[in-house]
Amino acid sequence: MDVIALHQAGFDNAVASLGTALTSGHASLLKRYTNEVYLTYDSDGAGVKAALRAIPILKEVGITTKVINMRPYKDPDEFIKALGAQEYEERIKKAENSFMFQIRIMQAGYDMDDPESKTAFYNEIAKKLLGFTEELERTNYTQAVSREYSIPYDDLRKLVNSMAMKGGIVKPQTKLKSGINEKNKKEDGMKQSQKLLLTWLIDCLLYTSPS
């Protein structure tokens, strides 16, 4: 089992939801012990679906979430057996921001060579950015998406603001002054107790991909 493999490799804060879907109750329990969770679900379609479902549940209770990339291996057990605990630790350090993970997965459903499909993708990004009610946070994520997907920042900002004004959802973003770049905050001395690896013990009958 994945959680056992993680503990044997020295990742003592690994926990599992024991084959059930992650619930708000699970999230509230995790919140008692940590403010940050690293998701390490299986890398197949079922695992991606589980991660996408878990992210908003964890966010609702105030937990910051990152997603560990285990490819080309399916799960933590396979990964550690093949590459070892040290490499897994490196994957933890490079874990993907949960919002950027959601955007990357969403992109797979669009044809980026087709102008109409590409525009639809940008509109969906803007809708998701509206989920950030604090202006500074929304601006930071707008910048991050702009860089990652080569979308002109001002164009994306205007699109988000337009949707916000039409929906009466949030205050529009202010335009950034030219020549000023936000620096990424680096994790500094994070205590191990603030990190948890959440692994999904998938029910084989429901989620195992057909061979």
Label for each model-derived stretch:
Residues 2-4:
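Acidic, divalent-metal-coordinating active-site segment for phosphoryl/phosphodiester hydrolysis
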Residues 7-10, 106:
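Gly-rich Lys/Arg/Thr-decorated short loops/hinges at beta-loop-alpha junctions or inter-strand turns
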Residues 12-19:
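Short hydrophobic/aromatic-enriched beta-strand-loop microsegments
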Residues 21-37, 41-209:
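A charged alpha-helical hairpin associated with nucleic-acid processing machineries
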